[in-house]
Amino acid sequence: MKIITTQSGFVKASEVKIPEIYNRRFKTGKEDLDAMFGGQGFLPGMSFTLAAGPGTGKTTMLIQMLELLERSGKNTAYVSAEESIQQLAFTCKRLGVRSVNVANMSTIEDIFDAVKENKFDMVILDSLPALTTRENLRGRQLEEYLSNYITTKAKELECVVGIILHFTKTGTYKGSTLLPHSVD
């Protein structure tokens, strides 16, 4: 069932048909980690951002989270536009992670073609500033395109998409706040 996001008049909440997708949330199984993401589990089609400074463990935490999901039967992937698959595989080996799919890709359309083909339940994109498109866009237009494309495709494919953002060493956010305000 498609989730309706258009405006409507008032209706009693008890009269609204709840899409079955809301009953397909899934958790990592680690209480503290699940609490970081709201405690209710990941809703297929949702998107989220994770922003932190360099060297704070974003990649480590998210790869370990994907491994937990793999162990529970979910199909996951970590896509880096910055690190080679050898670097990602080395990180996975160091962490004892064996089941997570890894790729080095930067073109957003290619990434989501692969997401669709592989039927991933969750994909992490590392990182927003390194993503590109087949369109000839730059700056704010590129950010708007990426933001809309990611959130639309996540919902269409019912795949949870996590996007890594960066803070500078001084603690300021790198980039606009467009994407953090667009995700679920």
Residues covered by each model-derived region:
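The Walker A/P-loop phosphate-binding site
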Residues: 2-98, 111-117
